[in-house]
UniProtKB/Swiss-Prot annotation:
Disulfide-bond pairs as recorded: none
Free-text comment on the cofactor: Binds 1 zinc ion per subunit.
EC number: 6.1.1.3
Pfam families (alphabetical): HGTP_anticodon, tRNA-synt_2b, tRNA_SAD
Segments for region (Catalytic): 243-549
Catalytic activity: tRNA(Thr) + L-threonine + ATP = L-threonyl-tRNA(Thr) + AMP + diphosphate + H(+)
Protein name stated in the entry: Threonine--tRNA ligase
Co-factor requirement: Zn(2+)
Length: 648
């Protein structure tokens, strides 16, 4: 007999070789009906695997986070089985679980179509209804390689060859479909998600490398309840309507083109939004005691080597070959640039330390809060680029706080206050905080890490904020905080960060004179609120579905005339608004008023000032608000006051 320890701490005895299925059945039939797998000593296992030693056992139910992941993994395998039956010449590659769903990569010459997805979905339903057993088998490596070679599944052969010799080769069989997989899985295909949907097809590369073979990726989602699936599909539909790439084109905010992949062309309206946000942040940080600086966009390789970025970040840096340039132009051959490459900066921190080091600093100068709206460049594979959300050229609302170890808590508290106010102003009242502590591989002593971690936690607790812990997810140079926003359709976006850094001050020889007169290293707090302007603007566009609040709207008021008698009055009002720093546009064309209103509301202009003969004679304005059919009559001074009231 063996002891089985249950989640409530109780101990029951079972025969050696008892399965998780037998244990859960003996405890509760209702629990068993919801159980999809078991956790044995915190390791997920199939229900039918024998347990031969004393262990802790916990049921993994279909409504738990782990249960849903297993459900989605099952559905990915059913997708692969369906594709192999319908398109036998297709190779199946890999099919992991992702947030809210799963995908499976396939190697196939002919692209999958939307009609194909419908046929595949029906075949998947048939497989689920058939309720084939899902069985785990352990094969010899040679047998597995030979089997998949015969099946012409050459990607599976590559995967097996990469598995360490010390690991067993586990295979899952359901019906006549066999796949390489670690598991665990449900006992049969009938357990699998009856509530699923294949959502899209996209291109992919083997191993995510654009130099490798092209693949086709089918995405899907799966849920334990129909209501959950319906809710997710509604959010997905909303996300598609709000897609910033689509709205960016329609509203003429920005565009991308092949000649500058990953680098946006900002149109007038989009650049207006950019400048509004920049001016707002600049004002906020000035009030918070920051100095604003500007550092070179291009820096020499030697500095990047000293900072450590050349070693760790080289593949993501854009570099310039100055040797060739200088030889072509017969310039001086012994300059420092001829011996080293230049690189476009991927971040601002090394440049900020150069400014800090330029003059001797005293402990009285700390904390020193240094900010920059720095233009940065990072190489991202073309397949990873995604509108404004993933770019190669971007501007950060970056700042570095040079402080002592004893000042970390106070500076963190001040930063959190600033960050929350900014998010509130942009329409994100809820902020989640994640705290990431020391990783296994790290710089600095345990004593320094203890102090830094305690300082961050103390700051969060002083603010009364809830937080979650990401164990071991801190940077190698210090712990960090991440700040997550929730948008209008429930999606989470990580934007703000605060990272403690003990390493960079040492590498770049930053120091200050302590109260005892000795040289000491400052601590650097790397912090950002928005992250990159580009990504944050993309988030704003999707959050507001393009209908930006008055203070952010590139055009705040459209002044339109109904009749010729109102043209002069319209021109006069338009000029008055401009003189009061209100972003106004004027339409005195002969188009019908309904056409004008529709055009400006399609362009998401918050307010339309409608002027006819009556308004011209009375000196009043008929105002229509975006999304409303009602008109309100006000004066120009009231309109100006209303817009100013909304300014941040």
């Amino acid at each position: 007999m063996i002891d089985i320890i249950l989640p409530d701490g109780s101990v029951k005895q079972y025969k050696i070789g008892v399965t998780g299925q037998e244990i859960i059945q003996s405890l509760s039939i209702s629990l068993f009906k919801k159980t999809i797998a078991v956790a044995v000593n915190n390791e997920l296992m199939d229900l039918y695997i024998p347990i031969i030693n004393t262990a802790t056992v916990k049921a993994i139910t279909i409504d738990s986070v782990q249960g849903i992941e297993i459900l989605r993994h099952d559905t990915a395998h059913i997708l692969a089985q369906a594709v192999k039956k319908l398109f036998p010449d297709t190779q199946v590659v890999i099919g992991p679980v992702i947030k809210d769903g799963f995908y499976y990569d396939f190697a196939r010459d002919k692209p999958f179509t939307s009609k194909d997805l419908e046929i595949i979905e029906q075949e998947m339903q048939d497989i689920i209804t058939k309720n084939d057993l899902i069985q785990r088998e352990v094969w010899l490596r040679a047998k597995a390689i030979e089997f998949f070679k015969q099946q012409k599944e050459f990607y599976k052969v590559k995967l097996i060859e990469e598995i360490p010799e010390s690991e067993e080769i586990s295979i899952y069989r359901q019906g006549n479909f066999v796949d390489l997989c670690r598991g665990p899985h449900s006992p049969s295909t009938g357990y699998c998600a009856k509530y699923f949907k294949l959502t899209k097809v996209s291109g992919a590369y083997w191993r995510g490398n654009s130099k490798n073979e092209s693949l086709q990726r089918i995405y899907g989602t799966a849920w334990g309840k129909k209501s959950d699936l319906d809710s997710y599909l509604h959010r997905l539909s909303e996300a598609q309507k709000r897609d910033h790439r689509k709205l960016g084109r329609e509203l003429e905010l920005f565009h991308f083109q092949d000649e500058a992949q990953g680098m946006p062309f900002w149109h007038s309206k989009g650049w207006t939004i950019f400048k509004i946000i920049k001016d707002y942040i600049s004002c906020q940080i000035q009030r918070a005691g920051y100095i604003e600086v500007n550092t070179p966009m291009v820096l020499n390789q030697k500095l990047w080597e000293k900072s450590g970025h050349w070693e760790k970040f080289r593949e993501n840096m854009f570099t310039l070959d100055t040797n060739a340039a200088e030889q072509d132009h017969n310039l001086i051959k012994d300059s420092i640039e001829t011996k080293c490459a230049l690189a476009l900066k991927p971040m601002n921190c090394p440049g900020h330390i150069q400014i800090f080091n330029y003059t001797i600093k005293s402990y009285r100068d700390l904390p020193l809060r240094m900010a920059e709206f720095g233009s940065c460049h990072r190489y991202e594979p073309s397949g990873a680029l995604y509108g404004l959300m993933r770019v190669r050229s971007f501007v950060q609302d970056d700042a570095h706080i040079f402080c002592t170890e004893d000042q970390i808590t106070d500076e963190t508290i001040k930063f959190c206050h600033l960050l929350k106010q900014v998010y509130q102003d942009f329409g994100f009242p809820e902020v989640k905080i994640k705290f990431s502590d020391r990783p296994e591989k790290r710089a600095g002593t345990d004593k320094i890490w203890d102090k830094a971690e305690q300082a961050l936690i103390h700051a969060i607790q002083t603010l009364g904020e809830e937080y979650t812990i990401n164990r071991g997810e801190g940077a190698f140079y210090g712990p960090k905080l991440e700040f997550i926003l929730t948008d209008a359709i429930g999606r989470e976006w990580q934007c703000g960060t605060l990272q403690v850094d003990f390493v960079l001050p040492e590498r770049l020889n930053a120091s200050y004179i302590s109260s005892e007169g000795s040289k000491k290293r400052p601590v650097i707090l790397h912090r950002a609120i928005l992250g990159s302007f580009e990504r944050f603007i993309g988030i704003l566009i999707e959050h507001y579905s393009g209908k930006l609040p008055i203070w952010l709207a590139p055009i705040q008021v459209a002044v339109v005339s109904i009749t010729d008698e109102a043209v002069n009055y319209a021109k006069q009002l338009h000029q008055e608004l401009i003189d009061n720093n209100i972003r106004s546009t004027l339409d005195i064309s002969n188009q019908k008023i309904n056409y004008k209103i529709r055009n400006f509301f399609t362009a998401k202009v918050p307010l339309i000032a409608i002027l006819g003969k009556k308004e011209s004679e009375s000196g009043k304005i008929a105002i229509r608000t975006l999304g409303s059919q009602e008109q309100h009559v006000i004066s120009s001074s009231e309109l100006i006051a209303h817009i100013r009231k909304n300014k941040k």
